[in-house]
Structures are given as C-alpha cells and as structure tokens.
Amino acid sequence: MALERLFRRKRPSGGNRDVPELWTKCEACGAQIYKKEFQENLHVCPKCGHHHRLPARERVAMLADPGTFQEITRLRPLDPLGFVDTKPYVERLKAYQAETGRPDAILGGTCQIGGVPAVLLVMDYAFAGGSMGSVVGEEIARGAERAAEEGRALVIVAASGGARMQEAALSLMQMAKTVMSLDRVWARRLPYVSVLTDPTTGGVTASFAALADVIFAEPGALIGFAGPRVIRQTIRQELPEGFQRSEFLLKHGMVDRVTDRRRLKEELVRVLRHLHPGVAYAPGV
C-alpha cells in the first residue's frame, strides 16, 4: 500500500487556475492551431485559409499605420424606448460593454493608411452582433463629416447582423443618416472604401456598406440583406451553391475584389493612393 501511495498521481491544489489556452480549432477544417501562430496570421487558418472573425482592435492595428490611430468614437447608447424582451435592453448593453470594453459596436479614429490620411471605422461583431443603433449610425455620420472637413479618405470595415431591433425605428433611421453623410465625402471628391467581412447583412448592407467607391470583401464572407435560411423559407426553393458568399457576389458584380486579409492593407493602400486627390500616385506601389 505504501508503494501504491508513492506512485499515485497527486492532483494539483489551489482550485481553478487561469491558464491560457495554447491552441484553437479552425471552424472550417477542424485543424488545431497554435494560438500565437493563429493571432500572427490575423485569425486566418494556415491549413485551409478560413477567415475567422477578427476583433475590432486587432483590425485597427492591422490597417492603420503604427502610432497614427487617434480614437474618435466615444458616444454611449441610451434606452429611449425602455425596451424589454427576455431582459431589459440596458442590461444587455452593460453585458456587451463589459465583454468587449467598447461603449457600442464601433471603433473608429483618424489615422494614416500607407501614408494616406484617413478616417477608419471598424464595426465590432462581438458587441450585439455588430448591430447598428443610434450610436453606430451617429459615429459613422460624424466620421464621414470628419473625413470631409479634414480631407481624409473614409474607410469602413463592416461586420453586422443589421439594424438593432431594441431601438426599433430609431435604428432604421440610421440607414438614411449614414447614406446622407456620405454626400459630404463625395462632394470633396474624397475616396470612400468599404470592406465587407463575415457577416455583413440587413440594414448595414442596404445602406452605407454597399455604396463605396471601391468595395472589398474577405473570402467566404456572408453578405446580403436577409439571411439564406429566411430566403429559402420564403421562396421555398433551394439556393444556388455559395449564394450570398463574397465569391458569389464578386461573380455577379456586387463587390469589386475578394481579398485575403493578409494582403488587405497592401491592396487598400494602392487604392487609396490612386484615388485620394492629395496623394501623388506612384505606379507599382
């Protein structure tokens, strides 16, 4: 018995420890990926190339030139309707804010992208599915106005399930507001570039996201108004293979280019330098 006790495995004491996960699993192919490699690869699977969702902060770090990003999105949402479903809207907002560290579903600021002055706005899908409510709409409108006033390009990275139902008509109103704000950018002949990521749906697709001078999309991104399941149930027909995915939209002229995330900044810089009136275009850059 003494010998058995000697070799018996002892359980570690101290309860649950905060040990970081070292591996992550690809949602598409199931490959086990070393988390550090996954992050360095911008959340793209090195095995199959599947593009996982990228946090807003990491998206900004990927696109903005180092040390140039100055945040301008600081508005906080209210609950003018006193909306309650299974729980009060204000409680949902507090939970999302605690989870993401963001006041709402958008992160934006002034920066340079490849030396081109820009206003960069990135939607955060982790906050209420990136839904567009009063704050998101107002921040986009203010960002567009800032770009026009300061002669900056406007770049918006979309990731959204659409309008925020808890704000009802106030949310739908943001579609018109964001579209109207783009007029100031175009009046100054400044470039507006949209990047559609997975997913971009609903009122976001039906408003500012689809109106850019140049529209990039990430590989495999779901892009559309209603989701495929809703459409299938409505028309009672099977949908074409790849329907509403970025490659399908490229084939049918709805986006200009499907670009791997790891090459996105390079291609974005090329477009901005070509279109921005205050930047001399250098062929081959």
UniProtKB/Swiss-Prot annotation:
Subcellular location: Cytoplasm
Pfam family, one: Zn_ribbon_ACC
EC number: 2.1.3.15
Main location as per UniProt: cytoplasm
One of the protein's GO biological processes: fatty acid biosynthetic process
Annotated CoA carboxyltransferase N-terminal domain residues: 22-285
Zinc fingers (C4-type) by residue: 26-48
Cofactor remark: Binds 1 zinc ion per subunit.
Top enzyme category: transferase
SUPFAM superfamilies given in the database record: ClpP/crotonase
TM stretches of this protein: none
Catalyzed chemical reaction(s): N(6)-carboxybiotinyl-L-lysyl-[protein] + acetyl-CoA = N(6)-biotinyl-L-lysyl-[protein] + malonyl-CoA
Cofactor dependence: Zn(2+)
Keywords: ATP-binding, Cytoplasm, Fatty acid biosynthesis, Fatty acid metabolism, Lipid biosynthesis, Lipid metabolism, Metal-binding, Nucleotide-binding, Transferase, Zinc, Zinc-finger
InterPro entries per record: AcCoA_carboxyl_beta, Acetyl_CoA_COase_Trfase_b_su, ClpP/crotonase-like_dom_sf, COA_CT_N, Znf-ACC
Amino-acid positions noted as binding Zn(2+) in the UniProt annotation, renumbered to this chain: 26, 29, 45, 48
Pathway annotation: Lipid metabolism; malonyl-CoA biosynthesis; malonyl-CoA from acetyl-CoA: step 1/1
Functional description taken from the UniProt entry: Component of the acetyl coenzyme A carboxylase (ACC) complex. Biotin carboxylase (BC) catalyzes the carboxylation of biotin on its carrier protein (BCCP) and then the CO(2) group is transferred by the transcarboxylase to acetyl-CoA to form malonyl-CoA.
Complex formation: Acetyl-CoA carboxylase is a heterohexamer composed of biotin carboxyl carrier protein (AccB), biotin carboxylase (AccC) and two subunits each of ACCase subunit alpha (AccA) and ACCase subunit beta (AccD).
Family: Belongs to the AccD/PCCB family.
HAMAP family, per the entry: AcetylCoA_CT_beta
Descriptive protein name: Acetyl-coenzyme A carboxylase carboxyl transferase subunit beta
Organism: Thermus thermophilus (strain ATCC 27634 / DSM 579 / HB8)
